[in-house]
Amino acid sequence: PYHVGEVISERSRLLLQTPESLRESLDIDVRIATEVVAIDREAKTVSVREVDTGKEYTESYDKLALCMGAEAVRPPLPGIDHPAVEVLRRIGDMDRIKTRLDAAIDAQKAGRRGTVTAVVVGAGYIGLEMAENLHHRGVKVDVVELAPQILPPVDADIAAPVERHLRMRGIGLHLSTAAAAFQPLADADGNDRVSVELNSGTTLKADLVILAAGVKPAVQLVKDAGIELGERGGIKVDTHMRTSDPSIYAAGDAVET
């Protein structure tokens, strides 16, 4: 969020390590733009695909560690795939968001459009950080939250002063409210905007929508391999982080004990 808001101006400062630095310091072979598409537990191999070239090959393993993390939740709502509706989970997401935002702000500065607007769906930590940074860029921000308060995990008396601060800053809060649909919008401010329909009957016009409604474990690869999942849908591991396959371990946001 803070690079989108240009509080952190240099993109490189977000990257604590690079493939080159990991190779030099720890002799780790890091292959970026590369995806594991299948696990053969019996043969102890993984099928690998290079994203840019489509080339596929296999690698063998003695022990395998699964650290795929989580992916942002995209509810099955009408219009959810509109290009103005984004999630912020990875660097690539950030780049797309910033490119769209920069273009809208540049058009505003050139007098070709009015105020840039954004809707943030979800008032957790990521959602509020995005709201803060969009506001920092001069964007008119509305936040939509299903719970009756922002920051649902904390007590109401902690959330209340933050809500007052946001409203004083001109950020709109739509609490106990959900996004119901996203419709393409073309008007004097641009032809690639989106209309956000709320279940309250309110409609918000936006140049950008950020979905910050939580994450879910990235487990499709694991499911396809027949590895056991837990009750909440994460990879089930024991106290040694072993999965149901004793040769395969898992760690991070995708696991549950």
Features from the language model and the residues they span:
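Glycine/serine-rich phosphate-binding loop and adjoining beta1-alpha1 elements at the start
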Residues: R41, S47-V48, T53-V116
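Short glycine/proline- and charge-enriched loop/turn segments
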Residues: P1-V7, G79-D81, E145, G226, ...
